[in-house]
């Protein structure tokens, strides 16, 4: 079965956003679809987290603004630094987009086996997989694989279309209970990361909570949760970020982002042997537009997280 990925009509997007806001944004718990999820996106939640002075020292030595939120889902212990400040979302949205589609369309429906067709005119910068598949199209499953494992930007845009664009994607976050994160633009415009610009931003606490809900919580059914985990574990773009700061025997799934202003972003779920998962979001950005991202900063911040959580 084939179809073209066309955006939802404007009225449909408005209705979806309004419904999500009415149902979920006023409470920070959501019973939408399956499961109830509490999303720690407010100051009152993160004020109880451990604040480690080593994060401030890393900021001084790196010249970057650093945001961290991590939670041990077994003990409930958390570590935070600038956890409620806004940072660019960039390509970290791609894992959440696939999670939203899995939530709407269980694997048993066959939705992820449908072929999406797109034109060469829709290709954007850095699309290593989709640029080779213009003639054949790609299944939704293949688009998620490309968007998460190699961060293919055209694949990300096709997934956004299926959700009703940036507005529909944001509505899906609201239905999780995330009243903070927002996506306003498409790839690659969403990567400007201008300091003080709230478009296309999230916070470490909100981003970690969203990934926790989808990968560890009961928002998704077991088959869908396993599929999202498999895509994240297969990611090839994060070897020098959070993964580099974790013990070698931990299983790790993550999604990175690298927008302008030297921003280095990573959000991960890690499974230590014999322990409950740990969810970690480490986000950084700099003041110069053409600065280089500091992958080593994210790795070192992760080492601090592991030490602080014990």
From Swiss-Prot:
The active site is at residues 91, 187. A lipid is attached at residue 32 (N-palmitoyl cysteine). It is found in: Cell membrane. InterPro entries: Beta-lactam/transpept-like, Beta-lactam_cat, Beta-lactam_class-A, Beta-lactam_class-A_AS. Inhibited by clavulanic acid. It catalyses: a beta-lactam + H2O = a substituted beta-amino acid. Its main location: membrane. The record marks 94 as: Increases nucleophilicity of active site Ser. A lipid is attached at residue 32 (S-diacylglycerol cysteine). It is an enzyme of class 3 (hydrolase). Keywords: Antibiotic resistance, Cell membrane, Hydrolase, Lipoprotein, Membrane, Palmitate, Signal. One of its GO terms (biological process) is beta-lactam antibiotic catabolic process. It comes from the Bacteria. The keyword Cell membrane applies. The class A beta-lactamase family has a specific amino-acid numbering system, sometimes called Ambler or ABL numbering and often misspelt as Amber. A multiple sequence alignment was used to derive a consensus sequence and then the consensus was numbered taking into account insertions and deletions. This allows use of identical numbers, e.g. for active site residues, despite differences in protein length. UniProt always uses natural numbering of residues, hence there appear to be differences in numbering between this entry and some papers. NCBIfam families: bla_class_A. This is Beta-lactamase AST-1. It comes from Nocardia asteroides.
């Amino acid at each position: 079965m084939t179809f073209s990925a066309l955006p939802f009509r404007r009225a449909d997007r408005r209705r979806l956003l309004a419904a999500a806001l009415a149902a979920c944004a006023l409470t920070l718990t959501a019973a939408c679809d399956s499961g109830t999820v509490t999303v720690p996106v407010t100051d009152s939640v993160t004020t109880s987290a451990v604040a480690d002075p080593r994060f401030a020292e890393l900021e001084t030595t790196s010249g970057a603004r650093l945001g961290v939120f991590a939670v041990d889902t077994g003990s409930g212990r958390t570590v935070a630094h600038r956890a409620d400040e806004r940072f660019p979302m960039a390509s970290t949205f791609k894992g959440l987009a696939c999670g939203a589609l899995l939530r709407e369309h269980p694997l048993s429906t066959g939705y992820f086996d449908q072929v999406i067709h797109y034109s060469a005119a829709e290709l954007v910068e850095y699309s290593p997989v989709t640029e080779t598949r213009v003639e054949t199209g790609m299944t939704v499953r293949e688009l998620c694989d490309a968007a998460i494992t190699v961060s293919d930007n055209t694949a990300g845009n096709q997934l956004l279309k299926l959700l009703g664009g940036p507005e529909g994607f944001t509505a899906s976050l609201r239905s999780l209970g995330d009243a903070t994160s927002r996506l306003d633009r498409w790839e690659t415009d969403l990567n400007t990361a201008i300091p003080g610009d709230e478009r296309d931003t999230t916070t470490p606490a909100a981003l970690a909570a969203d990934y926790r809900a989808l990968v560890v919580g009961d928002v998704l059914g077991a088959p869908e949760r396993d599929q999202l985990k498999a895509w994240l574990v297969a990611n090839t773009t994060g070897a020098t970020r959070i993964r580099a700061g974790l013990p070698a025997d931990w299983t790790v799934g993550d999604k990175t982002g690298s927008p302008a202003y030297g921003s280095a972003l990573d959000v991960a779920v890690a499974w230590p042997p014999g322990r409950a998962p740990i969810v970690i979001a480490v986000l950084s950005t700099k003041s110069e537009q053409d600065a280089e991202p500091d992958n080593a900063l994210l790795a070192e911040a992760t080492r601090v997280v592991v030490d602080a959580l014990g």
